[in-house]
Regions:
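Flexible loop/turn segments at secondary-structure boundaries
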Residues: 12-14, 76-77, 107, 181, ...
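A conserved beta-strand->alpha-helix junction
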Residues: 55, 130-135, 323-334, 432-450
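Conserved short alpha-helical segments that host acidic/polar catalytic motifs at enzyme active sites
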Residues: 1-229, 234-300, 304, 392
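PRPP-dependent phosphoribosyltransferase catalytic core
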Residues: 163, 178-180, 185, 205, ...
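Amphipathic alpha-helical
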Residues: 135-153, 305, 313-335
Length: 498
């Protein structure tokens, strides 16, 4: 999972790209990068770390131009500690393309082999984003023959070729030297992408493309709409906007985990308020709690900060149980789930959260979290609650059991790492994490909570909950190979302490 942004303006874009990446920081903490286009010259800077730590005044001054893209990285493919695989990526032909991608290709190895053997294109990293960039470059070379002029229609033909050749999830922003900004979304709409406008004094428009609508508010742009599944949009350097459907059979299947955890609560994705979705999840979860736990035994409902707070508040209100804040979050620690490496996650939990004994002593507590993926965090949190004096500790998850690998860009690709990876029951999970009981959202409840807010979205990617992979290419053999590759020891990158 990553965050991407693209901007076409009448003014220099470097500062606004930086501001947009700050608003998308929750989508990736591993690395950040910005690329701009000034005439026919690309400028870029990228490095490991948070946005505020990567960019300095001297870097920003070099990022000249009125058109640019940005990226925050959460590693799912390639080495988590390699600056070489930070984005944007670049190829010099055709024209020169700078590229940023959010998602994960499921046929990257096959496509990579084809690029080498047929198209004679070399891939220098293990990142599937570089593979996708080279497919786009190859298709654009075919769409614009020697002697022909570039056009938005040629760019759309190239995107059609991309859709035919690659599978998986992808939301892309790309700069084409001397031409403009191209953005497109995979035919299933798994990863989010939207755009907005701002009218200048002379009546011209600036365009902003982003993973989440929150950037539109922060940069004072008017949200226009989501990029449709399979659609591509092109904004020329002069601000001319074009769009086209580039997929043969597009379907909308947004990732349910965006609403559960990843996206900011003040974003709206495919017409669904993320905050509203989390409130609805709390209502549906309340029904499950009432069915599995004697409500008279619960003294208070308590969220695990921050993403579970709306669900916990709504659950407490519906069940008429007092709501309390028992954990204080250290806001200088990153999001635990998206930290690379299990060791790092375990180490960070107690640094991230501190329990207040006054809210726990002698009470039966219902802890509400957005999800229980590996169980790493929750096991330690339950222990902290008991150490702080709780008599009983119940746990409720606003997401269903995570039982299957995710192959579309979320860092939980093997069953061996999942606490429910072999179909473990709620009772077995409770024993494992040391809780008195565990209650899960149902898959039906999750889907209903989301469709309640936008009935036009009829399908979601819930593959990590129900094992249904919307791209149709995921087999047992694929998952077995993925798990085997994941379990192989990796050589530490230069500068690694572990």
């Amino acid at each position: 999972m990553c965050g991407v942004v693209g901007l076409v303006s009448k003014e220099p874009v470097n500062q606004r790209l930086y501001d947009a990446l700050l608003l998308l920081q929750h989508r990736g903490q591993d690395a950040a990068g910005i690329g701009t286009l000034d005439g026919l010259t690309f400028h870029s800077y990228k490095a490991m770390g948070l946005v505020r730590d990567v960019f300095r005044t001297r870097n920003m001054r070099d990022l000249t131009g009125n058109i640019g893209i940005g990226h925050v990285r959460y590693p799912t493919q390639g080495c988590a500690s390699s600056n070489q695989e930070s984005q944007p990526f670049y190829v010099n032909a055709p024209y020169g393309i700078m590229f940023a991608h959010n998602g994960n290709l499921t046929n990257a190895e096959e496509v990579k082999d084809n690029l080498w053997n047929v198209d004679r294109r070399h891939i220098n990293t293990t990142s599937d984003s570089e593979v996708l960039l080279n497919v786009l470059a190859d298709e654009l070379s075919q769409a614009v023959k020697p002697g022909e002029k570039f056009s938005p229609e040629a760019a759309f033909e190239a995107v059609k070729g991309v859709h035919r050749r690659v599978k998986g999830s992808y939301a892309v922003v790309a700069l084409i030297a001397g031409k403009g900004l191209l953005a497109f979304r995979d035919p299933h709409g798994i990863r989010p992408l939207c755009f907005g406008t701002r009218v200048n004094a002379d009546g011209s428009k600036d365009y902003l493309v982003s993973s989440e609508s929150v950037t539109m508010v922060g940069l004072e742009f008017q949200f226009e709409r989501d990029v449709a599944p399979g659609e591509a949009v092109f904004i020329s350097q002069d601000g001319e906007f074009s769009c086209a459907q580039c997929a043969e059979h597009p379907t909308l299947n947004p990732c349910a985990f965006e609403f559960v955890y990843f996206a900011r609560p003040d974003s709206v994705i495919d017409g669904i308020s993320v905050y509203g979705a989390r409130l609805r999840l709390g209502e549906y979860l309340a029904n499950e709690v009432a069915s599995h736990i004697n409500l008279s035994e619960i003294d208070c409902v308590m969220p695990i900060p921050d993403s579970s707070r709306p669900a916990a508040q709504q659950l407490a209100q519906k069940l008429n149980i007092p709501y309390r804040e028992g954990f204080i979050k250290n806001r200088y620690i990153g999001r635990t789930f998206i930290m690379p490496g299990q060791t790092t996650r375990k180490k960070s939990v107690r640094q991230k959260l501190n329990a207040m004994p006054v809210e726990f002593e002698g009470k039966n507590i219902l802890l509400v979290d957005d999800s229980i993926v590996r169980g790493t965090t929750m096991e330690q949190i339950v222990r902290m609650a008991r150490e702080s004096g709780a008599k009983k500790v119940y746990v409720a998850s606003s997401a269903p059991r995570v039982m299957y690998p995710n192959v579309y860009g979320i860092d939980m690709p093997t069953r061996a790492e999942l606490i429910c990876g072999h179909g473990e029951s709620a009772e077995e999970v409770a024993k494992r994490i040391g809780a008195d009981a565990v209650v899960y959202q149902t898959v039906e409840g999750l889907k209903d909570a989301l469709t309640d807010l936008n009935p036009r979205v009829e399908q979601f990617d819930c593959s990590c909950f129900d094992g249904v992979y919307v791209t149709g290419d995921i087999t047992k053999e694929y998952l077995d190979k993925l798990e085997a590759d994941r379990m192989k020891p990796k050589a530490p990158a230069a500068g690694d302490d572990e």
